Amino acid sequence: GLVSSIGRALGGLLADVVKSKEQPA
């Protein structure tokens, strides 16, 4: 559903932020 799609998108963004903090370019 819409909520799970939004949750998945937010989870992906959060993972990207954490990953970029752990491994700065």
From Swiss-Prot:
One of the GO BP terms on file: defense response to bacterium
Record function comment: Antimicrobial peptide, that adopts an alpha helical conformation which can disrupt bacterial membranes. Each caerin displays a different antimicrobial specificity.
Keywords: Amphibian defense peptide, Antibiotic, Antimicrobial, Secreted
Localization per record: Secreted
Pfam families: Antimicrobial24 (PF16049)
Coiled-coil intervals: none
Protein name as catalogued: Caerin-2.2
Major location (coarse): secreted
Record bears the keyword Cytoplasm: no
Tissue: Expressed by the skin parotoid and/or rostral glands.
